[in-house]
Design a protein with these regions (language model features):
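Hydrophobic positions on the long internal alpha-helix
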Residues: 1-6, 10, 60-61, 117
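Catalytic loop of short-chain dehydrogenase/reductase
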Residues: 11-99
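Non-catalytic terminal and boundary segments that flank Rossmann-like NAD(P)-dependent oxidoreductase
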Residues: 27-31, 141, 146-164
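C-terminal helical subdomain
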Residues: 53, 77, 99-138, 143-147
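Surface-exposed helix-capping loop/turn segments at secondary-structure junctions
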Residues: 68-72, 124, 160-164
Length: 164
């Protein structure tokens, strides 16, 4: 929504960039069910919903690139790494040490990974997915161009519906 609201400013700017924060967890999504996106969740952990949102960020990045690269807008999706933030606050206490062993990043280190996309070569990497500062391959579902178009169009429809 924010990117679409800033569309005119992005088009007018020199070398505009949109960086969407994603996550490797997007890869657990096997199918994107648009009907379920409008229903209240029954999930207790929220992990599936989080994964879907991160998949959507990658698909949006790809479609933004396809639609706007010729107008000078670059787009990137990045998994910053496993960052030690409040997102883990609902994780059972006994599991937290396991995450620490996996090498959690400080928020500053995670932000550094995100900021890197502000400086990479846009002509080479726009529309791409990064994992911890490195261009990476997202899941097969995240590279489905038809799904990216469908998500874009559905999102436009929902935004129009709710902004009336």
């Amino acid at each position: 929504v924010l990117t679409r609201r800033l569309e005119r400013a992005l088009i007018c700017a020199d070398n505009a960039r949109v960086v969407n924060v994603s996550s490797k967890v997007h890869s657990i999504v096997k199918k994107l069910d648009f009907a379920s996106l409008r229903k209240p969740t029954k999930s207790l952990s929220g992990i599936n919903e989080y994964a879907v949102s991160k998949l959507a960020n990658i698909l949006f990045t790809s479609e933004l690139h396809r639609r706007y690269a010729s107008l000078g807008i670059s787009s990137f999706a990045i998994h910053p790494g496993l960052v030690d933030t409040e997102i883990w606050r609902t994780l059972p206490f006994f599991l937290r040490p396991i995450l620490k062993l996996k090498g959690m990043l400080t928020p500053e280190e995670g932000a550094k990974n995100v900021l890197q996309c502000a400086f990479v070569d846009a002509s080479t990497y726009s529309g791409k997915y990064f994992s911890k500062c490195t261009p990476s391959s997202p899941s097969t579902l995240a590279t489905d161009q038809e799904l990216a178009i469908k998500l874009w169009e559905q999102s436009e429809s929902w935004m129009n519906h709710y902004s009336e």
